[in-house]
């Protein structure tokens, strides 16, 4: 979820909690940025996707690993005719009617000239992916949003695409299928009114009677050359609603469209800047929050970021790791 670097607004820091669990174990190939996780229906094999190398991906027998690198989803680059179409970002995986869909973003750092594309495969094996190009969501400087960081929610027979990074922050649009929008207008579902609007990387997850909108906020990248003030680095936040299409509020009742958001996971111990998250209902561990983070004992460079995961406790109605 590359974006403009910025500071997290002071209002969003309210409610910061401590005592987070350390990340679960990871062995094998554990360096990732913006991970996406899915398990193959036919055999239970785990697949993990990441920003870079035309969407790199790896497989393992469990979420712990050992992770083995496979290759790239779109090795020739996206057919979307925009700068950045050979350096794809922010994968998101879904499974619909026997087919796996991998969303990706085409953009360049700090630009609104962006689009969300999709590739599909029935097996997720190397060289089986078909690139379909744009899903119909794109942006330029004339838009209120930046069309990156797509996330598809499959809710029964309905499909919703969450997307956005900075500018107008998080938007949603109805999809006709995992491949194309329904042609309706997009609408804002989360917005930080302060600073340069540091929200991105949304992930909408249904659990029980609520839809939980997870997102990353703060400065994401480049920590090896310049680190933000304490508390202004990446962190994972959430709002919830009984509707998939809006009305998201934080734990204090603040609207997510009015700078609301409850912190789920922030820097702690040797874990720094967790973000780029998703949620998966694991058959062994139950709901799991996965993300990338910096291990401060290893290094702060983007290519040193690691795959992290924690189980989520929803018993209070709010996610706790």
Curated annotation (Swiss-Prot):
Q: GO molecular function, one example?
A: arabinan endo-1,5-alpha-L-arabinosidase activity
Q: How does activity depend on temperature?
A: Optimum temperature is 50 degrees Celsius.
Give the pH dependence of activity as annotated.
Optimum pH is 5.5. Stable between pH 5.5 and 6.5.
Q: What is its EC number?
A: 3.2.1.99
The alphabetical list of record keywords is: Carbohydrate metabolism, Glycoprotein, Glycosidase, Hydrolase, Polysaccharide degradation, Secreted, Signal, Xylan degradation
Principal location listed in the UniProt entry: secreted
Give the protein name, as stated in the record.
Arabinan endo-1,5-alpha-L-arabinosidase A
Q: Does the keyword rRNA-binding apply?
A: no
């Amino acid at each position: 979820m590359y974006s403009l670097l910025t500071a997290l607004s002071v209002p969003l820091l309210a409610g910061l909690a401590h005592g987070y669990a350390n990340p679960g174990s990871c062995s094998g190939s554990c360096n990732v940025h913006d991970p996406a996780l899915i398990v193959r229906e036919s055999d239970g094999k785990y697949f993990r996707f990441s920003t870079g190398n035309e969407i790199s991906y790896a497989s393992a027998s469990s979420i712990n690993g050992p992770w083995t690198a496979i290759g790239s989803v779109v090795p020739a680059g996206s057919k979307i005719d925009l700068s950045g179409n050979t350096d794809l970002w922010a994968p998101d995986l879904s499974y619909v009617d026997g087919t796996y869909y991998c969303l990706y973003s085409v953009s360049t750092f700090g630009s609104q000239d962006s689009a969300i594309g999709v590739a599909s495969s029935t097996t997720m094996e190397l060289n089986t992916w078909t690139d379909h190009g744009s899903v119909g969501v794109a942006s330029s400087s004339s838009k209120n949003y930046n069309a990156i960081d797509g996330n598809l929610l499959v809710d029964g027979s309905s499909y919703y695409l969450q997307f956005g990074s900075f500018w107008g922050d998080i938007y949603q649009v109805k999809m006709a299928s995992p491949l194309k929008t329904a042609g309706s207008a997009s609408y804002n579902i989360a917005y930080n009114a302060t600073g340069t609007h540091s929200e991105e990387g949304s992930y909408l997850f249904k659990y029980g009677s609520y839809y939980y909108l997870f997102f990353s906020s703060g400065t994401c990248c480049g920590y090896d050359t310049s680190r933000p003030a304490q508390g202004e680095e990446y962190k994972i936040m959430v709002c919830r609603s009984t509707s998939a299409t809006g009305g998201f509020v934080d734990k204090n009742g603040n609207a997510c469209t009015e700078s609301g958001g409850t912190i789920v996971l922030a820097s702690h111990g040797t874990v720094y800047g967790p973000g780029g998250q998703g949620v998966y209902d694991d058959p062994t561990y139950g709901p799991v929050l996965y993300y990338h983070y910096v291990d401060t004992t290893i290094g702060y460079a983007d290519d040193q970021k690691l795959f992290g995961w924690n189980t989520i406790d929803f018993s209070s109605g709010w996610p706790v790791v």
